[in-house]
Amino acid sequence: KPELRYKAARQGLQELGHETTLSYLGEAARLVFEESDLLPHLNPGLMTAEDFQALRPVSASMGIMLESVSDRLMEKGEAHHGSPDKIPARRLETLRLAGEATVPFTSGLLIGIGETRLERVESLLALRRLHDEHGHIQEVIIQNFRAKPETKMAAALEPDLEELLWTIAVARILFGPEMSIQAPPNLSPGVLTRIVEAGINDWGGVSPLTPDFVNPEAPWPHLDHLARETEEAGKLLIERLTVYPRYALEGE
């Protein structure tokens, strides 16, 4: 968490009347939940059982990307080296606690960061086991890595389309027709029909108002264009809430 590493973050939080980022997030989510027509979706990273207990009443859903279960990626020179919050066991524990707290949850894989196809299958199976036990995973994202300037992986090769399509297809096979499988449309322009044909049924959050803050170099497709591409693949583009219907009906 930022307050554990940066003095400026601690000072900023204190000025806002909070000791932790998650406390501040909880207040912001409560204001959105109570004073607007929006439903908060929270993605604050690793969480404890107490964190879920505090945030569940002020959010409709939450999420954390598993990315990969490969401990090998934590080694020096690999994508997750020096990132303790990306230790697979810690992310899996957050996913497990989300299930125990009955939080409608989003997770998924980041492909093309040095993992093998076998490691992708192992990651998908880990998510499947957690979902089989708790039934809380609403959607599984298959996100392709995009290299960013001025980062340690700026020169890293990005995964090709076939790797993305293969992983989507395997996710659909492993999770069956009931699970929502998602891929960001702004990261694969020009091939959206092939992505649908591979097995997705959801584009995720696509905003006409804000950029993709994680991938600002990749603008969202215009909704009219996305609707046409979706129709060409034999599907319809419709809006949905951050919480899926059956989870909304099961909510307290």
Regions flagged by a language model, labelled:
Residues K1-D132:
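Conserved Radical SAM active-site core
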Residues Q11, L31-S36, V121-E252:
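Auxiliary Fe-S-binding modules of radical SAM enzymes
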